[in-house]
Amino acid sequence: MKPIELSFEFFPPKTADGVEKLRATRAQLLPLKPKFGAGGSTQQGTLDTVLDMQKDGLEAAPHLSCIGSSRDSLRAILDQYRSHGIRHIVALRGDLPSGMGEVGELRYASELVSFIRAEHGDWFHIEVAGYPEYHPQSRSPKADLENFARKVKAGANSAITQYFFNADAYFRFVDDARKLGVDVPIVPGIMPITNFSQLMRFSEMCGAEVPRWVARRLESFGDDRESIRAFGADVVTSLCQRLIDAGVPGLHFYTLNAAIATRTICERLAV
């Protein structure tokens, strides 16, 4: 059986201590031989993090968001990435600035994908985002799927999904996408569970559903962090095993710049 491909999400640190913590995290995860590491928030912070990843010998896939950006600014960023030998981009719409309407010259990720292809041809491997439980701002499940298909047909090579805890939601999303002609790999996004309140806050923001039984168990542990981590590792390992058994093309972990939970899950899976 072909080994499952792993990739890890990091976010650019805001402090010197954060930079050192992220380096330590990567050092702990590199033995798992990830296919690439992704990350982004601020443009300069993203570049600094990406260049640091490259020093570790890790292929980097910076996030690139189009909301609030002009074509000229996007062109400059892409040229900069290419000049550093970066071949992998995660193309996103991005979040709308608070209190503002649609801003920037490109409004949708599909337009960003088309722009990257027009500017750089096949130089970049382009990832886009998928939402098994649908984007929280989508008009309907049908509209969300159609938007996903547009991103892929604009020239994306593959997709990474938002995290989820219901494998059936992912399987249904993939089936529905295939019916719309999407034929690229759709890699499931995985969120290790280490903090109950943080998990619920993130899930509320991004529209990911935490099963009631999982939430109730986590809540029952109160401040017992060890029990939360142990139970969380059990839940996420079981989810990953089901996905692997179904033949997913990879697993993409949202590490939150921490290594232990992700490494524990991968070691249990023997991947």
Task: Tell me what each language-model feature is.
Residues 9, 32, 81, 151, ...:
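Conserved, mostly hydrophobic/aromatic
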Residues 19-26, 40-58:
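Glycine-rich, positively charged N-terminal anion/phosphate-binding segment
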Residues 4-23, 60-72, 125-143, 220-234:
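Active-site mouth loops of central-metabolism enzymes
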Residues 17, 104-131, 180-233, 238, ...:
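Active-site pocket-lining/capping segments in soluble small-molecule metabolic enzymes
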Residues 66-83, 103-108:
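Glycine-rich anion/phosphate-binding loops
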Residues 10-13, 37-39, 63-69, 94-96, ...:
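Active-site beta-loop-alpha junctions enriched in small/polar residues
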